[in-house]
């Protein structure tokens, strides 16, 4: 995506904002309001988590304790309150296998790795959306990690005792974060299903979050399909009743199909998106926003890197993304009723493994063909809301 490419690429497949248009797409704009639309919160101005912990600090260490699992510390934080005081959970270097639930209504929690790098603290498990509830029980609660009366018991039971044929995408997450004001810092979350399955649809989420004012800093989030799901508490039919704001900064995200997706208002800054071909999934997509049709903004990606492995750049090319027409499998896309994903990728670098002529694909779920927007119609519901500004090609 050199300057020459930007000037000659057809606007019918690659819509580019003007300078005046791009000036309105800022972090402040994306974070101007949040929470329930019936009584929204005001602007959010996140700052990096750099100061030493204040208030309660719970120590997690798999060898010494006092908490040997992350969930034990989360349970203690939820049980002891108060609801408005931040709880810091310090996680010692090591590998922690198991699911972590941060239930709705929990106090503000900061989970942070105490190692020198995010690789030093690793939360992991192999989960597949195709698992039966019985398989989920065996993977998640084989040793009684979750018990009646635990703060997360209801969340666990909702999946394990559902009676459904498959657990579904959200339940495949290694970390499920459903409270507001969560901060995750300096650690790795890995759904280790990875390349142990075929290239068909195997949603395997590393992190699911639907709270407001969520901060993700210096994380490594690794999976294949559906690595990071940034959702909201709105119903999936397409109209927003709730806005979840998420700031993703200085992170590494890895996957193959729709691996950053959802309905949140999210800003990504200095993030490395790495697309892999190792599972043989074929065409790859990074972003898959499902922005409610009545919200003007979804994903803002700025000053980021998009890279691919050696399987791309010859006959196979990755795409920057596609819209996710969430909830419209039976009806097809319906303007003014179906979600219409919004994303702007700006001031970022793509390697040669990406499609520079048609970076946006047909919508997930419905197969709706990509239709580029033009100046003056960026939020029209009969076109896609996927655009770029001042990106370039490099290593």
Residue ranges and their predicted role:
Residues 2-395:
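Sequence-level preference for short, compositionally simple segments enriched
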């Amino acid at each position: 995506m050199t300057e020459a490419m930007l000037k000659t690429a057809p606007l019918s497949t690659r819509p580019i904002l003007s300078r005046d248009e791009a000036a309105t797409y800022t972090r402040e704009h994306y974070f101007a309001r949040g929470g329930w639309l019936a009584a929204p919160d005001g602007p959010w101005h996140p700052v990096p988590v750099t100061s030493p912990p204040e208030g309660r600090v719970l120590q997690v260490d798999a060898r010494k304790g006092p908490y040997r699992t992350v969930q034990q510390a989360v349970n203690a934080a939820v049980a002891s309150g108060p609801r408005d005081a931040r709880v810091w959970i310090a996680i010692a270097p090591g590998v922690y296998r198991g699911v972590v639930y941060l239930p709705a209504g929990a106090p503000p929690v900061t989970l942070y790795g105490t190692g020198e790098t995010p690789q030093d603290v690793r939360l992991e498990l192999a989960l597949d959306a195709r698992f039966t509830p019985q398989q989920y029980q065996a993977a998640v609660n084989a040793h009684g990690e979750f018990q009646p009366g635990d703060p997360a018991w209801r969340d666990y039971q909702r999946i394990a005792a559902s009676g459904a044929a498959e657990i579904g995408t959200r339940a495949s997450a290694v970390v499920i974060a459903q409270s507001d004001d969560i901060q995750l810092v300096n650690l790795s979350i890995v759904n280790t299903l990875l390349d142990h399955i075929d290239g068909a649809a195997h949603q395997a989420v590393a992190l699911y979050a639907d709270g407001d004012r969520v901060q993700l800093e210096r994380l490594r989030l690794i999976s294949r399909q559906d690595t990071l799901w940034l959702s909201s508490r709105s119903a999936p039919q397409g109209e927003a009743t709730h806005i979840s704001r998420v700031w993703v900064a200085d992170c590494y995200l890895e996957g193959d199909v729709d691996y950053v997706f959802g309905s949140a208002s999210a800003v990504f800054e200095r993030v490395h998106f790495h697309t892999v071909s190792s599972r043989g999934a074929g065409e790859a997509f990074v972003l898959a926003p499902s922005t409610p049709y009545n919200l003007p903004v979804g994903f803002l990606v700025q000053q980021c890197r998009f890279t691919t492995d050696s399987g791309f750049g010859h006959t196979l090319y990755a795409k920057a993304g596609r819209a996710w027409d969430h909830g419209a499998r039976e009806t097809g896309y319906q303007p003014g009723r179906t979600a219409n994903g919004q994303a702007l990728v700006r001031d970022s670098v793509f390697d040669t493994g990406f499609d520079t002529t048609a970076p946006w694909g047909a919508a997930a779920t419905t197969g709706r063909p990509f239709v580029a927007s033009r100046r003056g119609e960026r939020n029209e519901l009969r076109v896609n809301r996927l655009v770029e500004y001042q990106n370039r090609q490099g290593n």
